[in-house]
């Protein structure tokens, strides 16, 4: 089965995971590139990707995280698998220094987004490549 990676969209049309990725392009380019590469691999392998690249968030039902490290920073992008729609729904992300504990507020926020997505199935509309760059 092939998975499609999509961004969760809030009722006000904000897309937290996409905003996170944009901020990575400014502040942590290599970390962002690694997260995008892992997201692309998820399209092919889904939850079987493993290898420490994706892990379920055990205390948060249905929530998974993409995990990567670069130059003393850990990037985490939180997502859920929607098996009915063959979607990987990117929800939220954060960066922390190596050795810092997981960000409970960020995990709680992503969990709330996942619950909202399960009710609304709202994702961001596709943006043509040229519009993304402007």
Task: State where each predicted segment sits.
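Basic, Lys/Arg-enriched alpha-helical interface segments
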Residues: 1-74, 83-87, 94-134
């Amino acid at each position: 089965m092939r998975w499609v990676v999509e961004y969760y969209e809030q009722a006000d049309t904000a897309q937290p995971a996409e905003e996170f990725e944009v901020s990575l392009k400014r502040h942590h380019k290599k970390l962002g590139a690694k997260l995008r590469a892992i997201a692309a691999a998820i399209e092919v392998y889904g939850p079987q990707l493993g290898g420490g690249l994706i892990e379920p968030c055990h205390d948060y039902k249905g929530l998974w995280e993409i995990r990567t490290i670069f130059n003393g920073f850990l990037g985490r992008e939180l997502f859920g698998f929607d098996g009915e729609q063959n979607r990987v729904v990117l929800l939220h992300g954060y960066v922390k220094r190596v050795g810092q504990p997981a960000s409970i507020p960020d995990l709680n926020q992503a969990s709330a987004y996942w619950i909202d997505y399960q009710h609304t199935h709202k994702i961001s509309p596709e943006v043509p490549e040229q519009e993304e760059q402007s």
